[in-house]
């Protein structure tokens, strides 16, 4: 059974634009509900789909953070080319790391990093995450358990250069967070087991913006956009965006 591939999306809402960035091994569906909510509130939202994501896992390991960063940057320029002068960005996990990187690379109206890591717990945790993604993908293709196991054995032999590169990107962004002057709203799920949640405090403390907030979601885990407090999250992000000094 072929799995329907998630695609980039653009929801035309109004003159204010928000770039939405998904996480590592995730896809644009991770930020789709948030995009729909913001569209209803008058924001135009665009979410790119990173190369090697939402496709068979064998393709993921042949791409890397440089490709994904380029996809994020292209998403920003996509909105610019559509005539949007002021762009805010919200990103989940690795998308949150990229949202911070955009904050010191190009003009950004406001930044919402959600469960964004500033250091990796361990390569092992990330490696397990990739294996879980691979297994889940293969199961959803309707393959038998035997077939999935056989393919997983092969998959485990694939060199994972991606993980080292990912760590390097995260640590590079961490070293530059103090170059961010755009208003920032740091979002973190209290029950996040995927990253070290101290990352949220690091971002909040090191961002130089005079306008910054942090909120801990007590009932949520890592993929906070799908978790039980998502409605509250949508409202909080909207409230933050409304406070920005838009020129329209």
Functional labels for PLM-detected ranges:
Residues 91-95, 99:
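Gly/Ala-rich beta-loop-alpha elbow adjacent to hydrolase catalytic centers
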Residues 180, 186-188, 192:
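Short beta-strand/loop motif that positions the catalytic acidic residue
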Residues 34, 182, 196-205:
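Short alpha-helix in the alpha/beta-hydrolase fold that links the catalytic acid
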Residues 201, 205-223:
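Catalytic histidine neighborhood in serine/cysteine hydrolases
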Residues 39-57:
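Conserved alpha/beta-hydrolase
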Residues 112-122:
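Active-site nucleophile loop of the alpha/beta-hydrolase fold
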Residues 219-248:
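Catalytic active-site module of serine/aspartate enzymes centered on a nucleophile-bearing elbow/loop
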Residues 56-84:
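Catalytic nucleophile-loop/oxyanion-hole region of alpha/beta-hydrolase
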């Amino acid at each position: 059974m072929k799995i329907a591939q998630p695609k980039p999306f653009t929801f035309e809402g109004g003159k204010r634009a928000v770039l939405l960035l998904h996480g590592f091994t995730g896809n644009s569906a991770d930020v789709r509900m948030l995009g729909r909510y913001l569209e209803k509130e008058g924001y135009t939202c665009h979410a790119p789909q990173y190369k090697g994501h939402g496709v068979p896992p064998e393709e993921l390991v042949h791409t890397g953070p440089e490709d994904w960063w380029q996809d994020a940057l292209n998403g920003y320029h996509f909105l610019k080319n559509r005539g949007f002068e002021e762009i805010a960005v919200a990103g989940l996990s690795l998308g949150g790391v990229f949202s911070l990187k955009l904050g010191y690379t190009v003009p950004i109206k406001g930044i919402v990093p959600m469960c964004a890591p500033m250091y990796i717990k361990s390569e092992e945790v990330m490696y397990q995450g990739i294996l879980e993604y691979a297994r889940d993908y293969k199961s959803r293709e309707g393959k038998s358990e035997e077939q999935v196991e056989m393919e997983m054995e092969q998959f485990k032999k694939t060199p994972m250069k991606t993980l080292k590169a990912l760590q390097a990107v995260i640590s590079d962004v961490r070293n530059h967070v103090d170059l961010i002057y755009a208003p920032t709203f740091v979002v973190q799920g209290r029950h996040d087991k995927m990253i070290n949640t101290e990352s949220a405090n690091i971002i909040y403390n090191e961002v130089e913006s005079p306008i910054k907030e942090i909120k801990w979601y007590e009932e949520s885990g890592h993929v906070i956009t799908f978790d039980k407090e998502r409605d509250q999250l949508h409202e909080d992000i909207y409230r933050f965006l409304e406070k920005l000094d838009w020129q329209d």
